[in-house]
Amino acid sequence: MKKILSPLMLAMAFASAGSAMAQTAPAAPDSTLSFNVGAVSDYRYRGISQSRLDPAVQGGADYADKSGFYLGVWGSSIKWIKDAGGDSNMEVDIYGGYKFTVGDIGYDVGFLRYEYSGNKLNPSANTPELYGAVTMGPLTAKYSQSTGNLFGFSNSKGSLEFGVVGVVGVWSLE
């Protein structure tokens, strides 16, 4: 009996130690607020330099609610507005939208406004844009369309962009 009881007691001790160490994961927050800041050697947007091949300072803030709604603001130093006769050296993007999933497919719909205070261009460089994206696994397809003139170009209302991006692997530095 002593030989049976010892292994049984040992097994029970290990089982109870494991449950004592198990912890409940913290509940997801109702909302998140995050910030970012950085510097780049050349700020490019859709392949075009926004800083005339010079460095740019950038930063932003994002708020997301667990319901899927989000709002954000992002800014960068720029130079191209001055080249066009304007007086703005700063781009500020204001955006908001709604993200949700159905099964394994993620969706994102939103509105984005590129704002260049003091640009004084006619037509204005300020650009409103609607967008929608679909994500399946590592691939995301996104469609964006301006609802006004695009970055100060006359008769450019309705300009669009479509792109597909994907993750090809995970990298880490040690």
Positions of predicted regions on the chain:
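Outer-membrane beta-barrel proteins
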Residues: K2-L8, A13, G18-E174
